UniProtKB/Swiss-Prot annotation:
Superkingdom of this protein's organism: Eukaryota
Protein name: MAD2L1-binding protein
Keywords recorded for this protein, A-Z: Cytoplasm, Cytoskeleton, Nucleus
Region called Disordered, residue ranges: 1-30
Region (Interaction with MAD2L1), start-end ranges: 49-81
Compartment(s) of residence: Nucleus, Nucleoplasm; Cytoplasm, Cytoskeleton, Spindle
Disulfide bond sites: none
Primary location group: nucleus
Gene name tied to this protein: Mad2l1bp
Iron listed as a keyword: no
Subunit text: Interacts with MAD2L1.
Organism: Mus musculus
Length: 276
């Protein structure tokens, strides 16, 4: 999935590209997208009330080389879908929901179509939730095409300033472009979700009620984004259950980006959970 460095630099906004002279190109090539949501079933869990952030709630993932900006977007989208399922905001993994709730019988199959129409009203909530999630995923892809994204926040419950749970994806240590060929996307996803599985961050959490989910992304202030709404004074919450997933690509560390050039943007849609 990796695009050429020349193409990436022409599409992204003014953030400087990291120096990748240290990196030797891998021999791997990209594989088709894999669905990892079904690998880890939802946690069955006793309770852990909201509490200040504890440093142990950290999942570090190190890739053996740089990845593309498109891959960074895919990591974000897959993590969002995974969290919604693990935290019981979706009754099934995203891909299964798309299959079961979007499969309309053929017109000639009258009996099946009547049965489907009888349950269609009950499916509207699911269809609306899927449409909103697909909209967020689509606009995330557009956003990642515009700018480097150092951080992503997935906020569950409460509001953007004081969520009940929040999940941080730290992409600031990655060198996301400047190479002709990146790592195998499917292998990177397996590495990411294996690290999450081993950390087992959901097992001690109580099954939550249905909650709203807010997506925040950090990007260059001059990226020209018009769907995600800029939040100039936003600060990452300091309370609530927090899990941080940090992605890096080994040595050397990526040069720090000027913090004043990057601001938070909030999705204008709050994703609503639903049960069957």
């Amino acid at each position: 999935m990796a695009a050429s460095g020349e193409e990436d630099m022409s599409e992204l906004s003014p953030a400087a590209a990291p120096n990748l002279d240290w990196y030797e190109k891998p021999e791997e090539t990209h594989a088709p997208e894999v669905d990892l949501e079904t690998v880890i079933p939802p946690a069955q869990e006793p309770s852990n009330p909201a509490e200040p952030f504890c440093p142990r709630d950290l999942v570090p993932v190190v890739f053996p080389g740089p990845v593309s900006q498109e891959d960074c977007c895919q990591f974000t989208c897959e993590l969002l879908k995974h969290i919604l399922y693990q935290r019981h905001q979706l009754p099934l993994p995203y891909e299964q929901l798309k299959h079961f709730y979007r499969k309309v019988p053929q017109a000639e199959d009258t009996a099946r179509k009547k049965a489907w129409l009888a349950t269609e009203a009950r499916n509207r909530k699911c269809q609306q939730a899927l449409a909103e999630l697909e909209s967020v995923l689509s606009h995330l892809r557009d956003f990642f095409a515009r700018t480097l994204v150092p951080q992503v926040l997935i906020l569950l419950g409460g509001n953007a300033l004081s969520p009940k749970e929040f999940y941080e994806l730290d992409l600031s240590r990655l060198a996301p472009f400047g190479v002709d060929q990146g790592l195998n996307t499917a292998a990177c996803l397996r590495r990411l979700f294996r690290a999450i599985f081993l950390a087992d961050p959901f097992s001690e959490l109580q099954t939550p009620p249905l909650m709203g989910t807010i997506v925040m992304v950090q990007g260059h202030r001059d990226c020209g984004e018009d769907w995600f709404q800029p939040k100039l004074n936003y600060r990452v919450p300091s309370r609530g259950h927090k899990l941080t997933v940090t992605l890096s690509c080994g040595r050397p560390s990526v040069p720090a980006m000027a913090s004043e050039d990057y601001i938070w943007f909030q999705a204008p849609v709050t994703l609503k959970g639903f049960h069957e």
